[in-house]
């Protein structure tokens, strides 16, 4: 996941657990982990996780992964930009798409 999204992934819960189904909510979506677990997800990927959500998920046996707000939203935004550009030819309207990357936090300090 880290290689695909280009960001560090923090894992809360059992890092050795065998995972067959993952739920996901981009951005700050850690409050959605119970809905994913109810659908059979053994792990949940989000951009930002609240501390108590991580504790609750871990206690329920769900591995919670935090991969960065921007990193989890960018793939969807870029796909939407491409789709809008393609729809321009079908709908006959003027669509201008601008792709940019702005990160709220530039560096991590230890």
Regions found by a protein language model. Name each.
Residues 1-110:
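Hydrophobic structural segments
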